[in-house]
């Protein structure tokens, strides 16, 4: 047991020495700072897109079925492109977590940001996407879009209002999770700034 603790301490000392050497000349610190800014930007874009949907909720609840379905179809070109920022944010957070020394507050806040963003993305695939399949079933879309919307297709039944409520609630949940991710990575960035 003591031997394990000693080896663990040696590993931590070696790990910190590796990071210290990386930051010694300043170029590592500047690279890490630039990567942190890119990561913050990707997470902020993800949060902004989710928040945009959530903020439309009061107005969209007043729409009749035909108008609501028409409005749904206008989102997909822009928000599909914006989805790449979401994937980029998850990848960037994972890389940032790998590069962040453990243990430490910055590590835990970065981990929290990653967990929240992965949960936000999972909400899309498990809740939002199946309802998107329903909204898009009668809409003419490109072949790549048709392939995308056919993924995880489930038979949706019920009143359109029930599906609308699920879709809208999923976007409120996504906005909340993305906001928590953005707050977490921002806090992690303040620990990075304070380590100079």
Where are these regions (language model features)?
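Basic polycationic patches enriched in arginine
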Residues: 3-4, 8-12, 29
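Interfacial segments of alpha-helical transmembrane regions
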Residues: 31-44, 95-121
């Amino acid at each position: 047991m003591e031997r394990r603790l000693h080896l663990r301490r040696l590993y931590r000392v070696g790990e910190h020495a590796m990071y210290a050497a990386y930051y010694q000349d300043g170029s590592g610190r500047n690279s890490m700072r630039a990567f942190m800014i890119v990561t913050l930007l990707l997470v902020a874009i993800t949060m902004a897109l989710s928040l945009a949907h959530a903020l439309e909720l009061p107005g969209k609840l007043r729409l009749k079925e035909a108008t609501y379905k028409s409005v749904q179809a206008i989102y997909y070109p822009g928000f599909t492109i914006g989805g790449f920022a979401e994937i980029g944010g998850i990848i960037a957070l994972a890389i940032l977590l790998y590069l962040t020394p453990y243990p430490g507050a910055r590590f835990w806040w970065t981990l929290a940001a990653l967990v929240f963003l992965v949960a936000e993305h999972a909400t899309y695939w498990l809740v939002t996407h199946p309802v998107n399949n329903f909204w898009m079933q009668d809409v003419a879309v490109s072949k790549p879009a048709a392939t995308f919307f056919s993924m995880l297709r489930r038979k949706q039944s019920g009143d359109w209002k029930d599906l609308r409520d699920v879709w809208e609630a999923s976007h409120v949940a996504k906005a909340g999770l993305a906001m928590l991710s953005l707050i977490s990575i921002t806090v992690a960035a303040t620990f990075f700034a304070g380590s100079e």
